[in-house]
């Protein structure tokens, strides 16, 4: 299976130049939707929805989307953020996670621990049943008999939402606000506690009263995905000398649960978005 996926890494001729470099996107999720719909035009029989053809087309999309996502990102940061542009070819010897890291970095260098962490993140975020929003969206659209490109495009649109796939971006932004409020990674527990109280009172970050990265509709006691990611993060943090940053997250996690229990009478479990 891995060999089949790697054989499909190659992007169609002129696709990157015509669709990604000439028309950069402000938002990567929207650009991915655009790219998926464009791939429809490169398929000789795009509306064929029999089981075998759907499998072939699905694997083909699975193999190509990581490279397309990286190229869309490089185009975006070049045209909108005024950074240098560099485009690398996908390496057929690499896994999807390894190619992500190679394509995103100017020197294409990465460590095995970094690749393992990203691979773990990809697995933990993969479809875990038909009930989550984007997968359910896929099922609803596919039930009409439409093509897989239209179906996947709809799922990406759902995944973009801040209450679904965009939730970990909210965590990152929230933690940046907390760091600014507390004065940095070496802030004492009292300052972290005050920032959590402000978040819950709607006085910090987006003033929603939410502490992002906590709570889950199914994992009401603990989210095993968060525990797995936390352990992987520890390995990479030690290797990359980011232990101060990780320690801050761990302290925030502990204190946030304490404050939630005091204010709401119940501590919400850390979810997969917090450490991702």
Segments (PLM) and residue ranges:
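Hydrophobic alpha-helical bundle cores within soluble ligand-binding/oligomerization subdomains
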Residues: 1-276
């Amino acid at each position: 299976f891995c060999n089949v996926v790697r054989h499909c890494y190659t992007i169609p001729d002129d696709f990157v130049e015509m669709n990604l470099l000439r028309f950069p996107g402000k938002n990567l999720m929207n650009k991915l939707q655009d790219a998926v719909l464009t791939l429809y035009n490169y398929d000789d029989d795009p509306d064929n929805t029999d089981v075998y053809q759907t499998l072939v087309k699905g694997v083909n999309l699975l193999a190509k989307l990581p490279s397309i996502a990286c190229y869309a990102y490089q185009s975006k940061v070049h045209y909108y953020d005024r950074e240098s542009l560099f485009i690398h070819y996908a390496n057929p010897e690499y896994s999807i996670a390894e190619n992500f890291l190679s394509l995103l970095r100017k020197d294409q260098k990465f460590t095995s621990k970094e690749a393992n962490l990203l691979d773990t993140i990809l697995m933990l975020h993969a479809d875990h049943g038909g009930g989550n929003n984007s997968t359910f969206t896929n099922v609803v659209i596919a039930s009409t008999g439409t093509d897989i490109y239209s179906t996947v495009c709809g799922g990406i649109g759902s995944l973009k939402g801040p209450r679904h796939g965009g939730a970990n971006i909210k965590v990152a932004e929230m933690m940046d606000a907390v760091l600014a409020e507390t004065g940095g990674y070496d802030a004492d527990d009292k300052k972290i506690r005050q920032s959590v109280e402000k978040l819950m009172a709607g006085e910090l970050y987006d003033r929603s009263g939410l502490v992002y990265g906590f709570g889950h509709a199914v994992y009401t006691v603990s989210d095993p995905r968060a525990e797995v990611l936390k352990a992987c993060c520890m390995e990479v943090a030690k290797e990359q000398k980011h232990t101060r940053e990780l320690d801050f997250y761990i302290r925030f996690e502990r204190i946030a649960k304490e404050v939630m229990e005091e204010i709401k009478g119940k501590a919400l479990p850390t979810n997969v978005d917090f450490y991702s």
